[in-house]
């Protein structure tokens, strides 16, 4: 499975033990006693620090030894979701306020996880493109403040990377796992299908964030790796090798694309006054104090306002980016989520969180309608309405001119599947939970025969406290 570069503390400890367990062991939710004989429930906390908000994904997992051999050793039984706004990048001038913004999420997690399970519940916070785009040391200052809050949360913070900026390609990979886990395309309880993952059963995942966009899929034809060198990720997923095609395009997220497209239409002299002009908004309309990456802009509509003009500029931006043609996916349904889903929902292309199937041409048709609206029609108080013409036009151009899908390309838009969010959070939670539980099981197995129970307890206390004293401590008792 794809594991985070986990705690130096635990990895070193695990290496020193040199133990291979014959059975995976899990912390039981009922009494907190480690065993591998009974159905167990345990938790993992993932905090998604995105460009527009910070989201808690708290997962309650269940492990049933009776069915674990059929594929995945545990499954999500329940997801708790909560979001706070704005995103961490909005606190660039006050890092301590960024840490304070997490408190409602941490309080919710403390409420949901039994107290005796806190130290057995791993927590991780991953920031995405919003922080990547901050200048200078601003991102580091925010992360330092946030890290202190996470490490003092009462949960198990996996040193040293419990808090960091997630590489864009990891977003894509974890999102792909979440999607395919929820759709049961990798493992299924249906005996006629089999329990071994296969490329032809999996689906492609397209994620559109604020600062970047990601695509990930499992190619049937591995020639694509020769055409696009560097887009390959070899993954071990619960003992099965998977070779994924994945890439993240920084600057092609929806909010970042807005600024890039607006700048293409605006003369440098006008732009220097923090004024931007766009044919994607009607003449006479002005959007004041729009903020992105700590800069404020006034956006002005144009007399050339139309879908054709807006599309022309948008297409120029998309074609100048690194988005590539994906022949293998043509005609096959691909799954779109995040801002893809949100803008489709705003436009009435789908209804409700379950989403639905559409064709690419419907994004174009929705964009044409949005681009015909007059000044009074877009000034209705909705934060997305003034941008609807540009956003829908960009999404259409990204898929049509970037990935070069035809207008009849089938698209599946999803926000939730089986009542759970489609995001990279669940994929990361599986990786984090499995790494944590395997390490805990190995330590417990290795020390179960230790005659001095006080020594065993002290080692676990050191592990849970996150102190690097455990290394020197273990060297002492190894002599």
Curated annotation (Swiss-Prot):
Highest taxon in the source lineage: Eukaryota
GO BP: GDP metabolic process; UDP metabolic process
Alphabetic keyword roster: Calcium, Glycoprotein, Hydrolase, Magnesium, Membrane, Metal-binding, Signal-anchor, Stress response, Transmembrane, Transmembrane helix
Pfam family, one: GDA1_CD39
Active site: 171 (proton acceptor)
TM ranges: 8-24
Glycan attachment positions: 300, 452
Lumenal side: 25-479
Reaction(s) catalysed (UniProt annotation): a ribonucleoside 5'-diphosphate + H2O = a ribonucleoside 5'-phosphate + phosphate + H(+)
Function, in words: Hydrolyzes UDP and GDP but not any other nucleoside di-, mono- or triphosphates. May promote reglycosylation reactions involved in glycoproteins folding and quality control in the endoplasmic reticulum.
Protein name per UniProt: Nucleoside-diphosphatase uda-1
Natural source organism: Caenorhabditis elegans
């Amino acid at each position: 499975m794809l594991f985070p570069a986990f705690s130096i503390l635990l990895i070193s400890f695990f290496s020193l033990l040199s133990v291979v367990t014959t059975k995976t062991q899990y912390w039981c939710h009922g009494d907190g006693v480690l065993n591998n004989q009974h159905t167990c429930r345990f938790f993992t906390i993932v905090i998604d620090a995105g460009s527009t908000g910070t989201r808690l994904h708290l997962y309650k997992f269940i492990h049933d030894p009776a069915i674990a051999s059929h594929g995945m050793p545990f499954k999500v039984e329940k997801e708790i979701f909560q979001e706070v706004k704005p995103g961490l990048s909005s606190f660039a001038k006050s890092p301590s306020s960024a840490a304070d913004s997490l408190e409602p999420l941490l309080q919710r997690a403390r409420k949901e996880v039994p107290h005796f399970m806190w130290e057995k519940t791993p927590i991780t916070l991953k920031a995405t493109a919003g922080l990547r785009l901050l200048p200078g040391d601003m991102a580091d200052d925010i992360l330092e403040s946030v890290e202190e809050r996470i490490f003092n949360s009462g949960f198990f913070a996996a040193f040293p990377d419990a808090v960091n900026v997630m590489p864009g390609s990891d977003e894509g990979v974890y999102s792909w796992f979440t999607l395919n886990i929820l759709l049961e395309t990798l493992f299924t309880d249906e005996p006629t299908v089999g329990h071994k993952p296969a490329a032809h059963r999996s689906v492609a995942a397209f994620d559109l964030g604020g600062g970047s966009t990601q695509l990930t899929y499992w190619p049937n034809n591995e020639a694509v790796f020769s055409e696009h060198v560097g887009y390959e990720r070899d993954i071990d997923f619960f003992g099965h090798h998977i070779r994924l095609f994945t890439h993240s395009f920084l600057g092609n997220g929806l909010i970042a694309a807005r600024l890039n497209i607006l700048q293409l239409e605006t003369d440098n002299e006008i732009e220097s006054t923090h004024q931007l002009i766009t044919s994607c908004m009607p003449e006479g309309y002005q959007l004041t104090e729009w903020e992105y990456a700590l800069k404020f802009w006034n956006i002005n509509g144009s007399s050339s306002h139309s879908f054709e003009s807006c599309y022309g500029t948008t297409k120029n931006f998309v074609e100048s980016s690194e988005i590539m043609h994906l022949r293998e996916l043509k005609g096959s349904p691909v799954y779109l989520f995040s801002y893809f889903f949100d803008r489709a929902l705003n436009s009435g292309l789908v209804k409700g969180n379950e989403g639905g199937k559409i064709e690419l041409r419907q994004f174009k048709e929705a964009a044409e309608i949005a681009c015909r609206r007059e000044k009074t029609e877009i000034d209705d108080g909705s934060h997305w309405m003034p941008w609807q013409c540009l956003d829908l036009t960009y999404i259409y151009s990204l898929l049509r001119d970037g990935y070069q899908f035809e207008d009849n390309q089938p698209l599946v838009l999803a926000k939730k599947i089986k009542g759970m969010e489609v995001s990279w959070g669940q994929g990361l939670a599986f990786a984090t939970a499995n790494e944590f539980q395997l390490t805990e099981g190995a330590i417990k197995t290795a020390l179960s025969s230790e005659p001095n129970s006080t020594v065993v307890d002290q080692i676990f206390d050191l592990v849970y406290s996150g102190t690097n004293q455990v290394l020197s401590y273990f060297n002492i008792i190894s002599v």
